[in-house]
């Protein structure tokens, strides 16, 4: 009935104030009789009630104005107007094609070229901005050195020979990547979580230990130092002091958090105050499941030390649980578990998860269709941003990724894919509506091995980490190259693209006879249909056979 707390408390004030005034006039206090004692008691209760409503109204008004003001200040023309690295934001066109069903019948033998969606729309991306600073790794190494006296597991970050100099250690053994960010409009800042990895042997893909670090940026992506949030003692930038399971093995390797993904979590606390906080999902090895890789959630501003392992009801832990893509639906924390589309709903207090949509967990349906995996968080598209005839469903937009082997001259290729999922507002069943071809945001990733060409290196890694900001036709995306960078691009025209695609497929969204599980499997499979064509073209246009750095 009420769309916001402000509307609710406004209505209460309008209702209660006149009633209270009438009561005070009808039953005035005259003397100290028994009747007047009752009137006095009731008037005190009414006064307290009105004061509480007024307090809640003012608090809701402050939050609402803070939200509106922050959003307005953030989006004058572009989501990013200036940064330390870049002044004017220049955009260049990007070609995106994908796959969706319109009137095709989903069959196991369906050809991917029959469900291509290839509209020539004005999608554009900015140049990439580097969010890592040269001094970041030294800062976080120094911070860990300070914290060693409080937590001896941090000693594992300092297993270097006495003759090694710090500059060489940082260059060969330390990495900062997987930067996932979210906009906290109540505070007018971006919260960003990073993975800080240390490898005793200098092998990036087999680190000794990893820990999460937090940074805060203003609306223009300028880092804020000494930043604190209400209800939290952490001061940013900082190492996030979450629990790290060190296992039972004598050799300590690949410990700690990997692949962090952050989303906005909002709730009302026991004092009636609306809270905004970052909620982080990550995977890590855990002794609770016999040293298997498990998913966890972490709320650094709520409890900076506690992590909660996620478990699926009636489903034994797999050897590796990873790549769950988080999103919020109402007050629920959900995850895209895998493709064909399975959705989990998880309790943030105890980590218990239930499958709420998608095929059952069994050997056959559990096989992943194609190469598609979870990538970023998913963000809900506001209903008011869509035409009225599309508002019977809720939609979420995100960026998945694929891992492809033997693609042209490259042995291993990781690339993003735009995805769109939805559900009818009267149902809990989610559907995968669209998946794009491989995209790269016009970025030519750094080679895995410095000094080599992409072809001679044989590995090209571009991982989307977060949809950090989304508003109208703009979005900001963070990504990493070669497991060693944190970068940001802005895109515009994305909402127009999605709206046109939904217009194209709207009749299919109403078709209750369709098979969403099979369609999801086919869309996932088709996502890499043109991979070989992409790699051949990229070799020529991006110079994969030439040294670029």
Curated annotation (Swiss-Prot):
GO cellular component, one term: membrane
Gene induction: Expression is induced in biofilm and by HAP43.
Keywords from the named record: Cell wall biogenesis/degradation, Glycosyltransferase, Membrane, Signal-anchor, Transferase, Transmembrane, Transmembrane helix
Residue ranges annotated as Cytoplasmic topological domain: 1-37
InterPro entries given in the database record: BMT1
Name of one Pfam family that matches: BMT
Name of the top EC class for this enzyme: transferase
EC number: 2.4.1.-
Extracellular side of membrane: 59-549
Localization per Swiss-Prot or TrEMBL: Membrane
Description of the deletion phenotype: Impairs the elongation of beta-mannose chains on the acid-labile fraction of cell wall phosphopeptidomannan.
Topology versus the membrane: Single-pass type II membrane protein
Transmembrane segments: 38-58
An annotated GO BP: beta-1,2-oligomannoside biosynthetic process
GO molecular function, one term: mannosyltransferase activity
Functional note: Beta-mannosyltransferase involved in cell wall biosynthesis. Required for addition of the second beta-mannose residue to acid-stable fraction of cell wall phosphopeptidomannan, and in elongation of beta-mannose chains on the phosphopeptidomannan acid-labile fraction.
Family membership noted in the UniProt record: Belongs to the BMT family.
UniProt name for this protein: Beta-mannosyltransferase 3
Organism annotation: Candida albicans (strain SC5314 / ATCC MYA-2876)
Taxonomic lineage: Eukaryota, Fungi, Dikarya, Ascomycota, Saccharomycotina
């Amino acid at each position: 009935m009420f769309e916001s707390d402000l509307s609710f408390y406004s209505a209460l004030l309008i209702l209660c104030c006149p009633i209270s005034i009438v009561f005070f006039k009808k039953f005035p206090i005259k003397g100290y009789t028994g009747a007047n004692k009752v009137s006095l008691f009731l008037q005190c209760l009414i006064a307290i009630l009105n004061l509480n409503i007024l307090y809640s109204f003012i608090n809701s008004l402050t939050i609402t104005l803070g939200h509106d003001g922050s959003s307005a200040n953030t989006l004058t023309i572009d989501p990013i107007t200036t940064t330390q690295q870049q002044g004017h934001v220049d955009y260049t066109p990007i070609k995106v094609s994908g796959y969706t069903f319109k009137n095709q019948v989903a069959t196991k033998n369906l050809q991917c070229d029959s469900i291509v969606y290839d509209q020539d729309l004005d999608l554009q991306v900015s140049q990439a901005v580097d969010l890592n600073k040269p001094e970041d790794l030294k800062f976080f190494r120094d911070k860990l050195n300070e914290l060693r006296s409080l937590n001896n597991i941090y000693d594992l970050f300092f297993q270097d020979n006495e003759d090694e100099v710090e500059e060489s250690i940082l260059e060969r053994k330390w990495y900062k990547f997987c930067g996932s960010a979210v906009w906290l409009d109540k505070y007018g800042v971006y919260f960003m979580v990073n993975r800080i990895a240390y490898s005793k042997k200098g092998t990036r893909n087999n680190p000794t230990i990893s820990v999460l670090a937090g940074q805060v940026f203003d609306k223009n992506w300028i880092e804020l130092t000494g930043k604190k949030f209400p209800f939290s003692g952490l001061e940013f930038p900082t190492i996030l002091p979450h629990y790290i399971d060190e296992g039972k093995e004598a050799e300590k390797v690949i410990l700690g958090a990997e692949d962090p993904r952050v989303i906005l979590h909002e709730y009302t606390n026991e004092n009636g105050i609306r809270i905004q906080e970052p909620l982080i999902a990550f995977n890590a090895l855990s002794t609770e499941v016999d040293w298997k890789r498990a998913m966890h959630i972490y709320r650094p501003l709520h409890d900076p030390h506690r992590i909660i392992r996620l478990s699926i009801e009636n489903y034994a832990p797999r050897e590796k649980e990873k790549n769950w893509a988080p999103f919020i639906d109402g007050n629920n924390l959900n995850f895209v578990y895998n493709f064909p589309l399975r959705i989990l709903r998880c309790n943030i207090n105890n980590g218990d998860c239930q499958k709420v949509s998608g095929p059952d967990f069994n050997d056959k349906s559990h096989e992943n269709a194609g190469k598609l995996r979870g990538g970023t968080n998913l963000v809900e598209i506001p209903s008011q941003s869509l035409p009225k005839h599309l508002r019977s469903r809720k939609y979420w937009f995100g960026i998945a990724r694929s891992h492809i082997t033997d693609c042209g001259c490259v042995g291993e290729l990781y690339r993003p894919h735009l995805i769109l999922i939805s559900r009818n507002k009267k149902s809990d069943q989610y559907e995968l509506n669209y998946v794009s071809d491989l995209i790269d945001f016009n970025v030519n990733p750094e080679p895995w091995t410095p000094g080599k060409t992409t072809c001679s290196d044989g590995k090209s890694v571009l991982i989307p980490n977060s949809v950090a900001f989304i508003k109208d036709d703009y979005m900001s995306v963070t990504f990493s190259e070669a497991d060693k960078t944190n970068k940001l691009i802005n895109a515009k025209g994305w909402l127009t693209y999605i709206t046109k695609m939904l217009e194209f497929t709207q009749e299919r969204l109403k078709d209750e006879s369709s098979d969403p599980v099979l369609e999801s499997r086919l869309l996932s499979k088709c996502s890499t249909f043109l991979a070989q064509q992409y790699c051949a073209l990229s070799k020529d246009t991006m110079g994969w056979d030439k040294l670029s750095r």
